[in-house]
A protein has these predicted regions:
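Small/polar-residue-enriched beta-strand and adjacent coil segments characteristic
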Residues: 19, 51, 57-60, 64-67, ...
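Amphipathic alpha-helical coiled-coil/rod segments that serve as protein-protein coupling scaffolds
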Residues: 87, 95-96, 114, 195-201, ...
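Amphipathic alpha-helical coiled-coil segments
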Residues: 78-92, 157, 163-183, 191, ...
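Short, conserved phosphate-binding/catalytic loop or strand-edge motifs used
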Residues: 120, 192, 211
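Repeat-solenoid scaffold signature
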Residues: 202-230
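Short helix-capping/hinge motifs at transmembrane helix termini and TM-loop junctions
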Residues: 203, 242-244, 303, 411-412, ...
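Terminal intrinsically disordered/low-complexity segments used for targeting and assembly
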Residues: 1-70, 228-275, 449-456
């Protein structure tokens, strides 16, 4: 009865010292994590719950993502980190088991040319560290947290890779569209130069008008070259994501883009970021690992208890040789209590506590960063969507203005400056219209990534 009472009283004591306490997962986040201006819709499936194949339906893009998931070196490195963490976890699990070793030994000796004496021993040794004070337990829980962190990191890299490939792919499509606009404009402005020169020959325009038109035409030709260079650079960037050499990227045209922005965006509750966003999960796992590291530092103040023993056959009994050999067994129990370690244990505990606080701050910052990214992506989506109709109407109005001023110039009722202004305004609006369409797509991709992005 006294022994049972002793055990019952020791367990709460050790728990109170912190070496047997368990990590409590974070379960609350600020409800306004996404910002006060972002309305939360919980009636539909969140964008972050969609699989990437459901969001990106372009076959060319899907093929590129598959290649990236297979070849990308950063993702492969993340997978190797998981393998390392799995090995560490296996080692931590087996630390509770006793260790065994076989150490056979034989000698042949002769003194003053007497008959040689042979001795042998075949011992099997065993040792077992008893985990009375939680050191092994906390190490195992820390290894498990680090394993989960490595898996979360792998998923975070995969989500970023998918978003990066998609963003780069649609960037190429946007640049293709802008290149087409500039090439058409180059042809149109070339015709305007010819028309202005004809008017000058007829005495209806001057040399300044021709020079201005030619300068504008040459500027567009330079823009065409710049866009071709940008396309090459973006193709190379995408090739790097695929871990492949520079190459032309097969893609659909901008007019065939199948990406549709949802009419209403559902982003879910802020608490879902703890479950959906892998980098936030990884930061929390790091905090959990630091928690158990602190427990391990506390347990180092307590005694270590171990059992060891050996058993085997030997023909050496001190100075006597016995043939045949006899069975020999021994067992030893030991307890080691740290008394004075030059402040090492106290220092390790302080370091562990500080690292735990750092991990908590990093987790809190990761959560704030995630909320900010969701907020910015949502506002960008709303802004680009609101601008879309305005830009469409602007382009339509400028097309009318350009055609009208061109006709008026041919009839001598307006100047070349008005035509030039209309041309430049139309080109700028068309490029802006294309860029805004790309921004609509990009902000959905960024929002998908900010919400965690399902990787199935």
């Amino acid at each position: 009865m006294k022994k049972q009472l002793l055990i019952v009283s020791v367990v709460p004591l050790l728990t109170g010292c912190g070496i047997y306490t368990n990590y409590q997962k974070a379960e609350e986040v600020p409800m306004n994590l996404y910002g006060e201006e972002v309305l939360i819709d919980t009636t539909t499936v969140g964008l972050g719950d969609l699989g990437w194949r459901s969001l990106f339906t372009d076959p060319q893009l899907q093929a590129l993502i598959e290649r990236g998931l297979q070849n990308n070196t950063d993702l492969q490195s993340a997978r190797l980190r998981v393998e390392q963490a799995e090995a560490a976890m296996l080692s931590a699990k087996l630390a509770n088991l006793p260790s065994f070793a076989l150490a056979p030994q034989g000698t042949i000796s002769s003194f003053d040319k007497h008959e040689a004496v042979e001795t042998y021993s075949l011992p099997l040794t065993a040792s077992w560290q008893l985990d009375f004070f939680g050191g092994i337990r906390n190490a195992k829980k820390q290894a498990k947290a680090l394993l989960e962190q490595s898996r979360d990191y792998e998923q975070a890299v995969q989500t970023q890779l998918i978003a990066g490939i998609a963003n780069t792919y649609y960037t190429l499509q946007m640049l293709d569209a802008q290149l087409s606009i500039c090439e058409q404009t180059e042809h149109s402005w070339g015709e305007s130069v010819k028309s202005t020169r004809a008017l000058m020959n007829a005495g209806m325009a001057n040399e300044a008008a021709v020079s201005q038109m030619e300068a504008a035409h040459l500027a567009v030709k330079a823009s065409v070259l710049d866009l071709k260079e940008q396309i090459n650079q973006v193709e190379n960037s995408l090739s790097l994501l695929l871990a492949e050499t520079p190459q032309h990227i097969q893609r659909t045209s901008w007019t065939e883009v199948t990406f549709e922005c949802p009419e209403s965006l559902s982003i879910g509750l802020p608490i879902q970021l703890l479950a959906n966003r892998p980098d936030v999960r990884a930061a929390e796992r790091n905090w959990e690992a630091a928690f158990y590291s602190t427990n391990m530092a506390r347990s180092a103040f307590y005694p270590s208890v171990s059992l060891s023993g050996s058993a085997g056959w030997t023909n050496s009994a001190g100075g006597v040789i016995i043939n045949p050999g006899k069975f020999l067994a021994s067992a030893v129990g030991s307890l080691t209590q740290p008394l004075f370690a030059q402040g090492r244990l106290v220092g390790q505990l302080k370091i562990a506590k500080a690292q735990q606080e750092q991990a908590l701050l990093a987790f809190q910052q990761a959560l704030l960063n995630a909320g900010t990214e969701v907020n910015e992506a949502m506002v960008a989506c709303e802004t680009s969507r609101a601008k879309s109709d305005l830009l469409d109407r602007q382009v339509a109005s400028l097309e009318k203005a350009y055609h009208s001023t061109s006709l008026l110039m041919l009839h001598g009722t307006t100047t070349y400056l008005e035509v030039l202004t209309a041309q430049q305004s139309l080109l700028s609006a068309q490029l802006q219209q294309t860029a805004n369409r790309f921004k609509e797509i990009q902000c959905i991709i960024n929002l998908y990534s900010a919400l965690g992005g399902s990787n199935y």
